[in-house]
Amino acid sequence: MAGHQPILTVSEVTRHLKRTIEDDPLLQDVWMRGEISNFKHHSRGHMYFTLKDEHAKMSAVMFAGNNRFLNFKPENGMKVIVRGEVNVYEPFGQYQLYALEMQPDGIGNLYLAYEQLKERLEQEGLFKEENKKPLPPVARQIAIVTSPTGAAIRDIASTIKRRFPVAQLTLLPVLVQGEEAPHSIAKAIRQANEVGGFDLLIVGRGGGSIEELWAFNEELVARAIYQSVIPIISAVGHETDYTIADFVADVRAATPTGAAELAVPDLKELISRVNQYTERLKRAQHELLKRQKEHLQRLQKSYAFRYPAQLVKQKELELDQQLERLTKHQRRMVSDAKDRLSQLEYRLKRIHPEGRLRQAEQARVKLEVLLKKEFQQMMERKEQQFQQAISSLNLLSPLRVMERGYALPYKAKTQELIKSVKQVRMNDRLHLRVTDGQLICDVKEIESESGGEGYDQK
């Protein structure tokens, strides 16, 4: 047994190999060429096979989620190019290929170039929908970029002439395969944009092998399509063929005939629609005329047509009423505005010290006026009461009695009113008050009304 060497289990060694392979970026995205053997298509959709060459072989699996996109059926003995990742299947301790894509060998280099260019252009945004231009609703000037001798031009031209004969077609002849084809196609697209006047471009060719269609997978053609200000329909190959040009073009057609159908409307269908719209317009016009005629007849029978002068007078009266209402409304608005202004001024004055002082002074003046008025009224009431009291006193006043010939006797010294002879003595001096003065008298004789003799005069 080795001195200090660690002793590993099979699982530990297998796990170490798995991590080592997973850390190698080359093995996580690798392209491999080989021959298929031991091929088995499982009922669940997965494909199991061995990929081998003259010197080695490797187990491989392609899960159903990936192999459903294959456009061919893998078989034993078929040479293929596979893209995938290498990893270790721990239970068996063996490494194997987990395939993601597969193509028949012979076109492997082209397919690899296709995938790399597609990925790069997609990252640049050449395939984004927001960059695509809408097709014109009716294209009258159409340029066709294709071979002048191929089936594509015949299919496109015959379809457009059948569907929309008024369209003007211009053929821009190009090479559609070979080394010079990409330059020829890109140049024609640029020339069409420089010349101008075209509503639409159709760029394409008929079907063929991937090598024959390869010009439409070149970056030069893709960028010419992307830079075109004229909308472009791509029509390359058959329905199952997809080229880089299809992804960049504004619209992709499955076939050249399909491109022609997308480019122009069907004139017969347009005529049919026009006829339908014409009939609908006629019916609508007839219905409108009918309604207008009925309306006119109602107007002719109306009061306005029969008595126009009265109607004018009535409208003048209504106008006067409206003007009066408007004037009142205007005055009311002005009055309301003045009221609001007064309220604001009042509120402003209330919160302003000068306004408060003036308000207090006004209140004082008002209070003073009120007090004077109240005092005046009180004096008037008191005077009235006094006059009433005087009148009452006058009714009881001795003066009134004296006016009838009576006099009031008073003692001269004490001014005591004499009500009885018993209050007087002989030789007392008396004052007799009459209405217009008084008399000074001396008592010489005293008689009692009882007829008796005078009382003691001492």
Swiss-Prot record:
In terms of one coarse class, where is the protein primarily found?
Answer: cytoplasm
At the top level, the lineage of the source is Bacteria
One GO BP annotation here? DNA catabolic process
CC terms in the record's Gene Ontology section = cytoplasm; exodeoxyribonuclease VII complex
Query: Which compartments is it annotated to reside in?
Result: Cytoplasm
Q: Which UniProt keywords apply?
A: Cytoplasm, Exonuclease, Hydrolase, Nuclease
One Pfam family assigned to this protein is Exonuc_VII_L
Q: Give the transmembrane region(s).
A: none
Q: Is Cytoplasm one of the keywords UniProt gives this record?
A: yes
List the Gene Ontology MF annotations in alphabetical order.
exodeoxyribonuclease VII activity; nucleic acid binding
List, alphabetically, the InterPro entries matched.
Exonuc_VII_L, Exonuc_VII_lsu_C, OB-fold_nuc-bd_dom
E.C. code:
3.1.11.6
Record's keyword annotation contains Nuclease: yes
UniProt catalytic activity: Exonucleolytic cleavage in either 5'- to 3'- or 3'- to 5'-direction to yield nucleoside 5'-phosphates
| Quaternary data | Heterooligomer composed of large and small subunits.
- Assigned protein family: Belongs to the XseA family.
According to its UniProt entry, the function of this protein is described as: Bidirectionally degrades single-stranded DNA into large acid-insoluble oligonucleotides, which are then degraded further into small acid-soluble oligonucleotides.
Q: HAMAP family given for it?
A: Exonuc_7_L (MF_00378)
Q: What is this protein called?
A: Exodeoxyribonuclease 7 large subunit
